[in-house]
Amino acid sequence: MRVLNLSSNDYANYAHDNARALRAIGVDCRDATINAHPFGYVTQSQVVTANQIITTYKQYDCIQIFHSDTNLYNLVKDHPNIVVYHTGTRFRQQSEFYRNAFPNAKHATDQCEFLINYPDLFYIAPHTELKPVEKAKDGKLIIGHYPSNSDVKGTKQIKEMLMPFDNDFDIRIDTRQLLHKDNLARVAECHIYVELFATEQNGKPYGCFGTSAFEATALGCLVITNNINEKAYTDVYGHQSFLTPNTVKAFQNTIFGLADRDTFDMTVEAMHTGFYSKHGIIETGQRIKQIIER
């Protein structure tokens, strides 16, 4: 089987990681993009032109299009086996349009909230190959928040909610955009990583963890994020490894409960159980293969 992954802009390196997971289980998968990623990932999709896609796509058994991209779909729409991934703002803001913009395609997502209105979407969580990094054992627990987009991730409200705990934790919030490897290094120092607090985006339901939640968990952080549709995750993967307070009161109660280091240590152990076996590259490749072969 030969698979071609296509993106115009590969947000969170998602199409590339998807291809790597397929290659890990022996699937011949090539990933290509129109534009290089600005975060400078160590590896990412090969940059190609639209003409190169047009002249080669029929050589593949399946075409996977990422981030609800109608322009790419129009280049390959006569292919008999197309999978479209809906991953973020584009689909969230115009879901009805994008749900119907890809006739005869199969549809997948990594966003739990999309399954509230579209339960037929095939859910695939990200994978990670990162390993736990030992945290400082002395001093205050470090809470970090390093958003890719501070408006989208709810940074202003996160700052306000954490203010009462300034004496109890070493709170580090930084909105500077770093190269991916440098961002991972600062995340790895944190005991607790706050990824997100935003249950709406421009009036539309939001509140679902992203790739950074999986990266931070793999690095050994206790992740606090949102998920307004936990069932979408638990139906496929079982126990969820993130804390997901979806109200201000629940968020602050969560932080208050973690101030005691013994409580924190027990919570990390309980929350991280089974994470690595569910979200490894092999397990994710096998999950992706299921929708390709549908």
Name every feature range the model reports, one short phrase each.
Residues 4, 132-153, 159:
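Conserved donor-binding/catalytic core segment of Leloir-type glycosyltransferases
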Residues 33-105, 109, 113:
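Extended catalytic core of nucleotide-activated donor transferases of GT-like folds
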Residues 13, 262-293:
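A charged, aromatic-enriched C-terminal amphipathic alpha-helix characteristic of glycosyltransferases
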Residues 218, 222-226:
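Short hydrophobic beta-strand element within catalytic cores of glycosyltransferases
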Residues 196-213, 225-236:
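Nucleotide-sugar-dependent
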Residues 184, 210-218:
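Short alpha-helical segment that forms part of, or immediately flanks, the ligand-binding pocket
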Residues 94, 116-140:
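Acidic anion/phosphate-binding donor-loop and adjacent secondary structure
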